[in-house]
Amino acid sequence: MEQLKQLLTAAGIAYKENEPLAAHCTFKIGGPARLFVQPVDRAQLCRAVALCKAQGVRYYLLGNGSNILFADEGYNGAVLDISSMQDAVEVHGTQLTAGAGVRLSALCKTALEHGLTGLEFAYGIPGTVGGAVYMNAGAYGGEMKDVLTTVQYLTAEGEIKEATAAELDLRYRHSIFEENGGCILSAQFALIPGEPEAIRTKMDELMAKRLDKQPLDKPSAGSTFKRPVGAFAAALIDQCGLRGYRHGGAAVSEKHCGFVVNLGGATCADVLALCEEVRAIVKEKTGYDLEKEIRVVR
C-alpha cells in the first residue's frame, strides 16, 4: 500500500487515507477505506486502476454511493471515487454522451434543456451515469437500456473498449459489468425530440411522486429488494405486517415498505440482519424468496 501511495502521488492523483465511507454513500453507513482515491478525469482513473492492479491492491469504483451498503469494518483496499471526476455531458443532435461520473439528475436536465425526451424516468434516481448503466437502473416504467446505445469502458486487462447496448446483457438490475470487471468510462444515449414543457411536467410529476411515496427524508440505499416475478416486494413485506419492523438502527420504512432506512446509528450488521429477517418471514408467509437489490461492499 505504501508503494501505491507513492505512485499515486507521483502521478498527481489525490487520495485520502482511512476515509469514512459512511460520508460517501446514501445509507450513511460504513467504516473507513484504506485509500480513498479521487481522480479528476478519465486519464487519472485509468492510471489509478492500472496502479492498483500492478501493486495487487483490490479496488472498488464508487459513484454517488446509492444502492450500496459498505461493511462496518470498511474496505481494505482503494475506493476510486468516480463522482470526483470533472465529467460533462456532450450533445450531438439527439445523442447525449456522458462521462461515468455525471449525476443522472444533470443528464436529465441537459436533455430537458435541449428538448429531448426519453430520460424523464431517471430524474430523481440518486446515482451517476456509470452506476446507473452498471445496474441498468430504472423507475416508473423506464430503464437505462431503453435509451442506452453504446458504452466505453476499461477492461479488466486495462484496454479501453466500446460495446453496444445489445452486447451488455442488460436486464432487470443487471449488466455484463457485474461479471466482467469492466470499468464504465462513458455512455451514449439516443433520445427523441420533444416539447420542453411536456418533458419538464413529466419530470416534475415523477419527482413529486418520489417525494410523496419514498422515504427521502431518511438515509437509505434506495429500493432494498428486487421485484420478484409476479409480485412487488413492498406489497409482500407490507402484507406480512413488517411495516416499521426494525433491527437496531435499521428499519423497514413506515412510508414505503420496499425501503430499509437508517433511523440513526444503524450498522451494516443491523441492515443485513433486518434484511434476512424480512426475507425469512416473507418466504414463510408468501412463498416468495426476496433477493436484495442493494450491493454489499466489504
Where are these regions (language model features)?
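Conserved active-site and cofactor/substrate-binding residues in soluble primary-metabolism enzymes
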Residues: 22, 40-43, 102, 106, ...
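Short, basic and Ser/Thr-rich N-terminal targeting/leader segments
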Residues: 55, 62-64, 147, 218-219, ...
